Amino acid sequence: MSTLRLEVPVPFKLRTNKIHFLILGGGGNGSHLIHNLTRLVKVHMDRGLGEYLITIADGDVVEEKNVTRQNFFLPDRGRAKVDVLANRYSRSHGLSIGTIREFIEDGKALLKAMEIPGFFPIVITCVDNHKTRKMVNEVYQQHPERFLWIDCGNAEFTGQVNVGFNSSRKLQEGESQAGMFKLPSVIEVYPEILQTEDLFKSEESCDDLGVRNNDQNIATNVLVATEVFVMINQLLSENGLSTYMVKLNAKTGEVAAKKTTFSNLKDF
């Protein structure tokens, strides 16, 4: 009689505790993410567990329609989203949060924004267009092991989070020690993204933005941002990251995780 053998995930663990988080997008997912990310960073820094910097990039201002679904309040209207978020959480937790008051839409701007001497970049794309993902992917492919890429996205009730690391070192069968190895990016998991034709946020019309805003659900945004936070919390822990992809459904409450096992990663 054969027995099923449970495959244990091999933790992905960074070699440094000096990290720069660059969040692209301060809307539905990004504004909720920074709420918990700043708390996590504050706890780790107070305990002497690492040095962390946070930068948020977004070219939008807060509108009344953002107040319900996104992490903003009525008095925030008319102000730059990045300024609202940076001021709120830097004052709350005594952190210095960098701001970029524009959309990052080309590779040179991305490299300039992520690079801070001595700090390893983690780029978090909280965007609702594939053109930005394709731009980030070009930099990701051209600069192996330069940064970790966390992407999150969602439809009305479904969402996903994906952690990618471009490395020639693949996880080997039978390997068990935590370390850094290749994790598939959102583009590798969903290669059809490369065939899409959409616009950068700065190129969209008012009609485009209105349709997109109405397609979102507040529960989905909160859950997606929470899953990103959970994965970052794992990543910064002593044990490392054991999940590289999560799919969720805000209507049913279902969450499905892909673990960092040889079987899951061998084909990427």
Give the residues covered by each predicted segment.
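Alpha-helix termini
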Residues: 11-12, 39-50, 114-117, 140-145
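Glycine-rich adenosine-cofactor-binding loop
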Residues: 17-47, 55-63
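Redox-cofactor binding/interface segments in oxidoreductases and associated redox assembly factors
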Residues: 123-126, 151
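Glycine-rich phosphate-binding loop and adjoining beta1-alpha1-beta2 segment
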Residues: 50-95
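Localized chelating/binding microdomains
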Residues: 2-5, 12-15, 81-83, 89-90, ...
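A structured beta-alpha segment of the ubiquitous adenosine-cofactor-binding alpha/beta core
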Residues: 77-120, 127-134
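Glycine-rich phosphate/adenylate-binding loop
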Residues: 2-29, 33, 130-131, 135-268
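Conserved acidic residues
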Residues: 121-122, 147
